[in-house]
Amino acid sequence: VTRPLDPGTLEQFRRPRRLDVLIPTRNRPAELAVTLSGLAGQEGVPGFGVVVSDQSDGEPAYAHPAAATMVRALRHRGHPVLLTRRLPRRGLAEHRAYLLSRSAADAVLCLDDDVWLEPGTLTRLVTALHELGCGFVGNAVHGLSYTDDVRPDAHRHYEEWPGRPEPERIRPGTPEWHRASIHSAANLLHVTEKLGPPAGAWRAYKVSWIGGCVLYDRAKLIDAGGFDFWARLPERHQGEDVAAQLAVLERHGGAGVLPSGAYHLESPTTVTERDVEAWEVVLSESTAEV
């Protein structure tokens, strides 16, 4: 019989460190266990913390024996883990803002609860953020069921940064907006195979936004407003990650990192009530203010 799982306390967890991983979850015990297993296999970034915030309808996902074992494995390997519940639900943006408030780390990885990271991914992302000095870097998630679906038209949107990423103001209708198409299906995997980077090497490329696995400089994310726009949104929304990244891009720049070590589990979404795009609301307000 599995013994009760210690959730940890904010006082013990919220301390300065190099990196915290922030995971929102709801009704996904199996997927959360896989996501945590990917983190437990990371090396090269000692002592990173993990926050899991659960909004499940019933028992929290981290209470499932498989997920609980991965929590214990992370702690056994020297990683502080804070387990919380955030109810009632007020939408994705509020959940992200809450998670961000739990951290005092230099960098925060916003990781979805249905993403497995291959070994070496965290080291590559942390290195890239440090060397590039921008607001965020990310790994777009691969959909491996699409490996035989090659889409050359999407590949043309891949463009590398020649040096440090520069701030960009990206809006719908601009050519830059279509960069996101490189992240659909297995497009980035196909681009990576075509480029054939040497083992251990990585490249920074231009993005409009990245879903699922984004590493922010925490101070730069907060400087750009974080997810504080949540209070201006209805509960039923999506696209909060896009809204935050557009703001960070405009102030501090950002980049995708190739190769990506992030793999999408391709499970059905638990965000079924998403009538409003958060980025549309935020952008319309910024336009009105001008």
Residue ranges of model-derived segments:
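Glycine-rich, basic loop-to-helix element that forms the pyrophosphate-binding segment
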Residues: 86-103
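Conserved donor NDP-sugar-binding/catalytic core segment of glycosyltransferases
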Residues: 120-180
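A recurrent flexible, glycine/aromatic-enriched loop bordering the glycosyltransferase active site
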Residues: 169-190, 196-216
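The conserved acidic donor/metal-binding loop of glycosyltransferases
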Residues: 112-116
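N-proximal low-complexity "stem/linker" segments adjacent to membrane-targeting elements
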Residues: 1-41
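Acidic donor-binding segment of Leloir-type glycosyltransferases
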Residues: 38-84
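C-terminal catalytic/acceptor-binding lobe
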Residues: 2, 34, 196-197, 202-219, ...
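Short aromatic/hydrophobic "clamp" motif used to bind/position activated sugar donors
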Residues: 108
